[in-house]
């Protein structure tokens, strides 16, 4: 605020806007509140991003509990009470969530093959690993989505923003894909797995061609057609 005061007094509109926001923000921070919870207009949010404040970043809590507590988070154990308290605080003060993981279990899972890991989790009464839950929660918080490409040699996942249309999603692979975009062949991951192969998915009518306005969905398996 002090740095821009002189420029603001000389009529610099950008400096005036930054000073005005700083004057609104400082008492909020002095009260021990994170910048994320300050109600701002769209233009103010844009300015705030330029301040690079840690407390303006999206927030997600991770609670580490013991192996025996993971399947009994509704109980009266000390760990369960702490988890509920963190979740309540996160919701009330930051409007965010909390993911529960067990570092002990994650360490054991890292040494197991996928099928054994799945059986191990089932025996604990949980469906997914803590790391998997943490990744999905972070993606949701940041507005990110994943689509897949597959071929004879490899299958790859690509990260895009929610709402990205097919050309923009193609550009994540290479700018030429976006520049010369023609169409995208789409099949959902679930349909592809259920059918067993791309050929059978085509026979079942699960493959379709989409154009430039198609919004790529989480879990889409995509083959781009382009020409440059």
At which residue positions do the language-model features occur?
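C-terminal-of-GTPase-core extension/linker across diverse P-loop GTPases
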Residues: 2-217, 222-228
